[in-house]
Amino acid sequence: GLMEFSLFAHMERVSRADSHEKLYSDFIDLCKMADEGGMRAIWTGEHHGMEYTIAPNPFLSIVDLAHHTKNVRLGTGTIIAPFWHPIKLAGEAAATDLMTKGRLEIGIARGAYSYEYERIVPGMDAWNAGKRMREIAPTLRKLWHGDYAHNGEFFQFPSTTSAPKPIQKNGPPIWIAARDPNSHEFAISNDFNVQVTPLWQGVNEIS
């Protein structure tokens, strides 16, 4: 199929001498270039308490990017699922879709750094992070659709409807970072897209 290019912009801080302000303005400039150059999408991630980047909430970055770009799709690369409650994730994603006028795509992963796990969900390992991701991802469309009650291993809540609802029909496309055959199977069976390149090194995606 057609190879479409995406930019993975992680706001890497190569030197401690770089201020956070400079890091962010460089990020915006890079994204403007990607948009003007006709790239399909810009993906930006979620990290906490790590010196090399400043991206605690990709939705914030994406809403700002929407004001600096015109055509490019804007994706979370990636949401770290186990750090989110499903209702909060569905609502923030839908609000972002609204604010970006329907340009949002959602990449979801279990996360990769024990540094973050230890600080945000103490005691959680990669296996349980994967289980949380597989529980949370399918709830999004159900919450956007509305009147969805959930009784899972990690989350339980009574009938809930996301407020707001996204403006894209059926919600923003959902991508699963498939680092193993399990997540690949999971993505296909839930009608999600598969992000095959490891997100920290990939620059293109195959569609």
Task: Outline where the language-model segments fall.
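Active-site beta-loop-alpha junctions enriched in small/polar residues
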Residues: 10-12, 47, 79-81, 109-113, ...
